Amino acid sequence: MALQDVCKWQTPDTPRPSIHLPQAGGWAVPRGCDPQTFLQIHGPRLAHGTTTLAFRFRHGVIAAADTRSSCGSYVACPASRKVIPVHQRLLGTTSGTSADCATWYRVLRRELRLRELREGQLPSVAGTAKLLAAMMSCYRGLDLCVATALCGWDHSGPALFYVYSDGTCLQGDIFSVGSGSPYAYGVLDRGYHYDMTIQEAYTLARCAVAHATHRDAYSGGSVDLFHVRESGWEYVSRSDACVLYRELQKARSLEQELEAKACGIYPEPATPQGARECKELFVEQEEVTPEDCAIIMKTETM
């Protein structure tokens, strides 16, 4: 929740000029109309679909995403890049409108470079997240759609922040954004712990995105994997999501078979006494003859 929501603050009717986008404010709307109201009524409704995730652990920050860019049922690009480098120690995942994400990441790079020249150092990950949230909050209510997870390493260690176009800025250990995020969260919540090894983190990220692409119709293609270390970010791999999911299913089936054998779901009797007890449990009942009925009736009359 953004600070504006907590304070019950509403965006002004006329957006103020932005110092970050010099051409902002010249909205192509009829004269006398409020841009915010006009866009909410007549603006195009764009379809979004993606799966991006990031999580922080002892050895840095992992960022992963699928590569399918889609607009509804139309697949625009099966091999797009949804994890964008900002500088040597900072990455960002992109979810939302592609044009908005690309524009604001260019603006963010420019602002960070200017601050580096003025102050002699780059801002922290927290400062970068607050800067991006403040810049985009000027366009709150104008159908801007940018949801990003900033993954970086600064003087405080690995850091992860979620920033949304309405000004929301959250810090956390796990974030997943996009239409496939509910499926990715299910895998992440089950396998995540802060002290995991690097290979465990790689496997968890690939597994989460692969499961999301299998269940979410708007995610697919391949799985891009990045790792942010103290020395900088590293591009780990790109794996086909369909092939990866099949391999995970085979590994899961093999693991279940081994667990079944180890737990002894179909155990054999360990002793002759156990064998006799099992045999008694499944022995067939003898048929009741007329002589038996006569004996029973005689016993009842007595």
Swiss-Prot record:
Subunit structure of this chain's protein: The 26S proteasome consists of a 20S proteasome core and two 19S regulatory subunits. The 20S proteasome core is composed of 28 subunits that are arranged in four stacked rings, resulting in a barrel-shaped structure. The two end rings are each formed by seven alpha subunits, and the two central rings are each formed by seven beta subunits. The catalytic chamber with the active sites is on the inside of the barrel. Incorporated instead of PSMB5 and PSMB8.
InterPro entries: Ntn_hydrolases_N, Pept_T1A_subB, Proteasome_bsu_CS, Proteasome_sua/b, Proteasome_suB-type
Tissue: Expressed exclusively in cortical thymic epithelial cells.
Function recorded in the entry: The proteasome is a multicatalytic proteinase complex which is characterized by its ability to cleave peptides with Arg, Phe, Tyr, Leu, and Glu adjacent to the leaving group at neutral or slightly basic pH. The proteasome has an ATP-dependent proteolytic activity. Incorporated instead of PSMB5 or PSMB8, this unit reduces the chymotrypsin-like activity of the proteasome. Plays a pivotal role in development of CD8-positive T-cells.
Localization: Cytoplasm; Nucleus
UniProt KW Nucleus keyword: yes
Xref: Gene3D superfamilies: Glutamine Phosphoribosylpyrophosphate, subunit 1, domain 1 (3.60.20.10)
Alphabetized UniProt keyword annotations: Cytoplasm, Hydrolase, Nucleus, Phosphoprotein, Protease, Proteasome, Threonine protease, Zymogen
List of catalytic residues: T50
GO MF annotation terms: peptidase activity; threonine-type endopeptidase activity
Enzyme class: hydrolase
Phenotype upon gene inactivation: Displays defective development of CD8-positive T-cells in the thymus.
Catalysis performed (reactions): Cleavage of peptide bonds with very broad specificity
GO annotation terms (biological process): CD8-positive, alpha-beta T cell differentiation; proteolysis; proteolysis involved in protein catabolic process; T cell differentiation in thymus
Annotated organism of origin: Mus musculus
EC number: 3.4.25.1
This protein's name: Proteasome subunit beta type-11
Pfam families reported for this sequence: Proteasome
Cellular component terms (Gene Ontology): cytosol; nucleoplasm; proteasome core complex; proteasome core complex, beta-subunit complex
Family: Belongs to the peptidase T1B family.
Gene for this chain: Psmb11
Main location (coarse class): cytoplasm
Residue ranges of the propeptide: 1-49
